[in-house]
Amino acid sequence: MASTKRRLNREESSVVLGEEQVAELKEAFELFDKDRTGFIKKDALKTTCKQFGVFVMEDQLDAMFAEADTTKSGAIGFPEFMSMMSRRMKQTSNEQILMNAFKTFDPEGNGYILTKDLSKALTTLGDKLTEAELQELLSISENEQKQVKYDLFVNTLFSKK
C-alpha cells in the first residue's frame, strides 16, 4: 500500500503561494503567536488550519507538526509553518479534485461507485495504475456489493500512514 500511496502522492512539493496567500499565512501565524516569540505550538496549529479551511484529524495534526518541527523543539517558526501549510493546501486541493472526479461516477449521489467503474478509470485514464496497484487499493476499500465508498478511498490514498 505504501508504494501505491507514494505513487499517487508523488507530488509532495509545496504549492507556490501568491503574495496574498503568504500575507494571510503570516497574519494567521502572528495571530496565533500570542507571546510574540516567532514560534507557534501544536495547539495553535489546529486553529490556524481550520481558519484556512484545512481540516485535519488529531493524528494528522500530530504528523504534520512532527514533520514541520525539524528541530523537535515543540514549536515551529514561520518558514516551517508556511512550508507545511503549503503542502497541506496542495494535498487538500488534490483530494478535492479526486473527490469531484469520483462524483461523476456516482449518478445516485450516494457516496459509492461501482468497483468496475473505478477499476476502468484507474487503469485506462490519466496516470494509469497497474493491476497490482489497483488490487492493493481495492483490497482495503471494496465492500461486499462490489462498491467503493469514495470518500474513504480518497482519505486512504492521501493519509500519511
From Swiss-Prot:
Record GO biological process: mitotic cytokinesis; myosin filament assembly; myosin II filament organization; response to differentiation-inducing factor 1; sorocarp development
One MF term in the entry's GO annotations: myosin heavy chain binding
Coiled coil: none
InterPro entries in the cross-refs: EF-hand-dom_pair, EF_hand_dom, Myosin_RLC
One Pfam family named in its UniProt record: EF-hand_7
Other information: The sequences of all three RMLC calcium-binding domains have diverged significantly from that of calmodulin. Therefore, it seems unlikely that these light chains bind calcium. It is potential that phosphorylation has taken over the role of calcium-binding in the regulation of Dictyostelium myosin. In D.discoideum, cAMP stimulation induces RMLC phosphorylation; this chain is phosphorylated on a serine residue.
Assembly with partners or alone: Myosin is a hexamer of 2 heavy chains and 4 light chains (two regulatory light chains and two essential light chains).
Protein name: Myosin regulatory light chain
Native source organism of the sequence: Dictyostelium discoideum
Gene designation: mlcR
